Amino acid sequence: MWRRGSACAILKEGIVMHSLMRVGAGILLSVGLMASSGCGGSGETLHLEVLPPQQPVQVAEPEAVKIVIEPFEDRRADKHRIGMRTHLWGGVTNFNVTGEKPGEVYAQALADRLRASGWLDRSWDVRVAPAGSAPTADIVISGQIFEFAANAKSRMFSTYITTSNKLTITARNNVDRSSTSRSLEGAQTDTVVWFSEDDVKKLMTATVKDTLDRYLADTTISQRAVRPSR
């Protein structure tokens, strides 16, 4: 009886020790994975390419209306970055757009969209040019950016990502000296288990695309001028 009791005790102890070792190994693996995925930030800056990809429409020639888009004015309080990732174990990683000028990014994104499939689902003759350099253009589009942000907060086993923007786009019509302005803002969120900078890039790109989609939905082009669609 004593021997059988001792054997049972030893067996139970072995099972407990094996279970504890498996739990410990799991914890160490999780810690290692979190550490390797960057739970501590060094303050570096990641530059994100956020121009939405375009699928051009099939047209013979662009519409015969000359459109110039000026780089948007950046009126954000902090122009050194568009946001940051707060790491689980302290520290941050900063985010910025490629070229570090959101105003140029937005102007180029709008130009790409109009060339591919703009108003009335047509391609338009459009280029980006410095302010005041194209006085004879039929339409000159400018803008002001008040918010252009991308942030991520790492938590245990997940990272919460937010993107947002707020801006005004103004189209000045040469034909009658009129203008049309639209104020736009939007935000998107996502939660991921394994974080990468592509997650922020995709969400920011989607935010830019959504803003441009709404601008084109709110406006139209008629008689060589941009007008409210309703």
Predicted regions and their residues:
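Short secondary-structure boundary motifs at beta->alpha junctions and helix caps
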Residues: 89-101, 172-220
